[in-house]
C-alpha cells in the first residue's frame, strides 16, 4: 500500500474539508504527503515549488499548534531530505537552521530524548 499518493490526497482533502483546514495535524499530514509524493520526481521548478509549499505548511503548523515537538520532528526530517535534493535552495531558505532552532527549543523540555538528540546531530552534520 505504499506510495498511493492520489488516494492519500483524496482522504486528506476530505479531512481538510470537514475541519475547515484549521487542524494542524491534518495540515501536517497533507504537507508530508505533498513532500513524499513529489520528492522522488526529477528536479524541476514544479517539484521545487511543491517541496517548498510543504515546508511552508509545516512552518505554519509549528507556529499554530501546541504540539510543537511533532511538527519540529517532521520539519527536521524533511529539511535533511530537501537539502539532499536542492542544497543551494535549502541553504538560502535556512530550513536546517530553523530545524536546529526548533529542536534545541524542544530539547530544553526533553534533554534526554534520544531520538531528538539523534535528529539534532543529523541536522548538525548536514549544516557543515
Language model region names:
Residues 43-46, 112:
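Generic low-complexity segments that are intrinsically disordered, proline-rich and/or Lys/Arg-biased
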Residues 1, 20-40, 63-85, 101-104, ...:
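Amphipathic alpha-helical repeat scaffolds of TPR domains
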Residues 1-16, 24-29, 33-35, 52-56:
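Internal alpha-helical scaffold/solenoid segments in large eukaryotic proteins
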Residues 12-15, 19, 51, 58-65, ...:
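Alpha-helical junction/boundary sensor with strong preference for TPR arrays
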Amino acid at each position: 500500500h505504499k506510495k498511493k499518493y492520489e488516494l492519500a490526497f483524496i482522504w486528506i482533502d476530505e479531512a481538510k474539508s470537514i475541519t475547515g483546514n484549521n487542524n494542524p495535524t491534518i495540515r501536517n499530514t497533507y504537507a508530508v504527503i505533498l513532500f513524499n509524493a513529489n520528492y522522488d520526481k526529477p528536479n524541476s521548478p514544479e517539484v521545487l515549488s511543491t517541496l517548498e509549499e510543504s515546508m511552508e505548511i509545516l512552518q505554519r503548523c509549528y507556529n499554530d499548534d501546541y504540539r510543537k515537538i511533532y511538527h519540529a520532528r517532521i520539519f527536521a526530517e524533511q529539511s535533511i531530505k530537501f537539502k539532499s535534493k536542492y542544497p543551494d535552495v535549502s541553504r538560502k531558505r535556512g530550513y536546517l537552521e530553523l530545524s536546529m532552532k526548533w529542536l534545541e527549543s524542544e530539547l530544553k523540555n526533553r534533554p534526554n530524548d534520544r531520538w531528538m538528540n539523534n535528529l539534532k546531530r543529523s541536522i548538525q552534520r548536514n549544516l557543515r
